[in-house]
Amino acid sequence: MLKYRTLSRSCHIFHPKSLSNNTLKSETTQELLQTVGFVRRSQVGLFQWLPLGLRSLNKVSNAIRNRMDSDGGAIEVSLSAISSKALWQATDRWNNSELFKLKDSKGKQYCLTATCEEDITDLMKNYIASYKDMPITIYQMTRKYRDEIRPRGGILRGREFLMKDAYSFASNEEDAFASFQKLDDTYNKIFKDLKIPFVSAWADSGDIGGEFSKEFHLIHESGEDTLMSCKHCGDISTLDMSQSYPEKDGQYSGDVDCKYALTKDHSTLICFYYPKDRQLNWNLALNAMDKDIDLTLRNKPNDHVLQVYEKDNEDIMFSKILRVMDCRLNSKSNFPDFPLKKYLKNNFGQISDVSIVDAQENEICGKCEEGRLEPLKSIEVGHIFLLGNKYSKPLNVKFVDKENKNETFVHMGCYGIGVSRLVGAIAELGRDSNGFRWPAIMAPYKVSICTGPNNPENSQRLQDVKSELLNDPTMQNLQNDILDQFNEKLGIGARIKLSHAMGIPLCVIVGSKSWPNVEIEVRGIRWGEKDLWRKQFEKRCSELQWKCTKNEHGIEKHTVPIQHLAEVIGVLLKDM
């Protein structure tokens, strides 16, 4: 007989004593996570994980870990949460305002790790000596810290969060890209295992830097990010990587905005002109200039850029000026005055017919040049990108190549999933007026058993149901995954309501009137294939005396004799 692990009654202390319909409907998702007992906020941006939330967090972590080990071929480590100032100075990231900084008793400075590029590179420097030691991918699942100025969105954007961060090391660009593709495939499998609808989008790697870059998002109206999706070719890109064109060029005659930039050698002043009601897209601007822009001046005001230009060029009269015109402008557009008083027209160059502003809804897709773009609000949950030698070079991580030369820097990649953020995002995705709806793989429990008040008859029925489930060989994965202990003061209706609010996919209702038949209320969402259970139902309903109905609230209910309960639950869980 399989042994069933019962829950300690002390866990009830973290459950809500009551849940009103108004609370379930009106609270934000992040507030409801606290009310139902998944987390509790201790300070702004800081959360304590309670038993329910920790179970879900650990299940997501294990799902990620399983794929990283089996498909990603990665090796797990655990780095210190405290990193030295020297490492971050070497990569010119110490002045990042989001770092939590601290000193020891001797005055030495450290930071709490927000990411671990510096530390993992410094670690692997001790173990990579030859090209034969690569490719290799290292990962960890640890807490990270960011001093967010305005933490918001609960566990979606806190000052402390659990993150899976992986780093690949390769001897050449080809192997580095192969690692990128391997982890891209692994990430797709991770999110498919979680049975959640996700999209991947080409993206900008941001301040961390890098070449190939892809983000993974959950589509939801509450998301802070915007993706642009083409209805024709299916391309999905982040807003900063999406290129669009108007229906017809040169149709904008209104006020024009201008942003100044310099080429990398500061010999040429670049003037980007675009409609005043649009936002300059720096990635598109870079493409228009074949990457020849000094991005350190990107966020500087125009006056500052002009001062640098005048300082670095002896005679402005003979210096080069390049105008880059967005394709929406025409000769009648209201251009701002040119700031330089002395210049030669012969030194002016011009690039026209390029799109250099953020895409908008219904504009033409820059990828296929046929379809229309549609904006999608989303929540970013993962990001993978190649780093090149951005970190291996300043930290001097070299290796002996095939020619026996020790002059080549390691090629790196970075692969992150916000684990705690993912829990918060899925909470948003599956939330309804009754609470949460989790995929079975990450629900705090897969099954709940709800009975009436404690008395000998109800206790015996509860034991019979548990024995039927846990003595079935096919139900071994339900060990320690059944919630049957509730506050004794809660009636059967309140227990069912609490189970639904917690998002437990299946609620087994054991009542005296229907016994020895039991009811199963389906709370889980069938995120993937929706009809697997129905095929089994049509095939075996007579054999198992299995009935399926929907009540007046649209809740799917299954009725089955206790001796067939395990088989039916096994079928129902497969597509949740």
From Swiss-Prot:
GO biological process, one term: prolyl-tRNA aminoacylation
Reactions accelerated catalytically: tRNA(Pro) + L-proline + ATP = L-prolyl-tRNA(Pro) + AMP + diphosphate
Main location: mitochondrion
Cellular location(s): Mitochondrion
GO cellular component: mitochondrion
PROSITE patterns, A to Z: AA_TRNA_LIGASE_II
GO molecular function: ATP binding; proline-tRNA ligase activity
Keyword presence, Lipid metabolism: no
Superkingdom of origin: Eukaryota
EC number annotated for this UniProt entry: 6.1.1.15
Pfam family, one: tRNA-synt_2b
UniProt keyword annotations, A-Z: Aminoacyl-tRNA synthetase, ATP-binding, Ligase, Mitochondrion, Nucleotide-binding, Protein biosynthesis
NCBIfam families membership: proS_fam_II
Comment field (misc): Present with 477 molecules/cell in log phase SD medium.
Family the UniProt entry places it in: Belongs to the class-II aminoacyl-tRNA synthetase family.
Protein's UniProt name: Probable proline--tRNA ligase, mitochondrial
Organism: Saccharomyces cerevisiae (strain ATCC 204508 / S288c) (Baker's yeast)
